[in-house]
């Protein structure tokens, strides 16, 4: 149910989207198949540990075409569709992203994730779809639709471990089905955005 009215407000929190270009360099090598396809990726992180910042730079690099650090090869950029439900990825102003999301990126700003993912598939034909903070049953249904349409997916979710995520009814089922080919765990050890682990879709540790 939508919130229609709020009153007796005692404080206000203003969140400012903060981009850090290059923060995804450490993980990009793990996110592509041998033939250059972007692998379905889930970023797991507690609040305030950098998952949205990491996703934002992943989007930019996938769109522009990253240069892998281990091989040094340039992977061609692809079209990316972003559903920015809370305007935290692109920070759009009058329809224009104020953060750099890449030259091949289309953004649906202030649009519900579950509806936006299906709208992008039907109208924009992206090769990769990116969303922040999934979790609802509707989100999972939209993700299944995206996968069945041949799009790759990049998403984030709140959690402190892979076991924690497996306990979430809807998302846990997706992971058991192998929907995500890469899973990245962030923690705040020493600094926000610290990469603690990277797994493949079968739970094998890659990093």
Roles of regions detected by a PLM:
Residues 63-118:
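P-loop NTPase switch/communication element
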